[in-house]
């Protein structure tokens, strides 16, 4: 199975600042068709996970453009610019390069008060 690793379990950010959340995969997620099958989700407290980014860098419908995704075949970054209070929750990367699909352990974003 492909192992997804998020080394930072948490991030503490001041509103208005930017933050980057990283993720690594044990195998390249770049497919021969040119797509990189890395996805980012946000699970807000008490809610179901919400898709933010699909195929590494594509913004999901309805997601603010403060969110962006980038990376290579095995190293990926989710960047949030101008962090807002509504951005709190746990951010997960997930690979859909091959079955079984696997998730990182998550990075919890918290806001400095």
From Swiss-Prot:
Residues 103-112 are annotated as: Framework-4. Residues 55-61 are annotated as: Complementarity-determining-2. The keyword Chloroplast does not apply. PROSITE patterns: IG_LIKE. It holds the Pfam family V-set. GO terms for molecular function: antigen binding. Keywords: Adaptive immunity, Disulfide bond, Hybridoma, Immunity, Immunoglobulin, Monoclonal antibody. One of its GO terms (biological process) is immune response. Residues 24-39 are annotated as: Complementarity-determining-1. InterPro entries: Ig-like_dom, Ig-like_dom_sf, Ig-like_fold, Ig_sub, Ig_V-set, IgV_Light_Chain. This is Ig kappa chain V-II region 7S34.1. It comes from Mus musculus (Mouse).
């Amino acid at each position: 199975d492909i192992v997804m690793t998020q080394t930072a379990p948490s991030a503490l950010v001041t509103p208005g600042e930017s933050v980057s959340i990283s993720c690594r995969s044990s195998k390249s997620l770049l497919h021969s068709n040119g797509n990189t099958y890395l996805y980012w989700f946000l699970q807000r407290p008490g809610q179901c996970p919400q898709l933010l980014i699909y195929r590494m860098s594509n913004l999901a419908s309805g997601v603010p453009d403060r969110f962006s995704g980038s990376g290579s075949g095995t190293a990926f970054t989710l960047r949030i610019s101008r962090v807002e209070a509504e951005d709190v929750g746990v951010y997960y990367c997930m690979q859909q390069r091959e079955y079984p699909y696997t998730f990182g352990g998550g990075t919890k974003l918290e806001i400095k008060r």
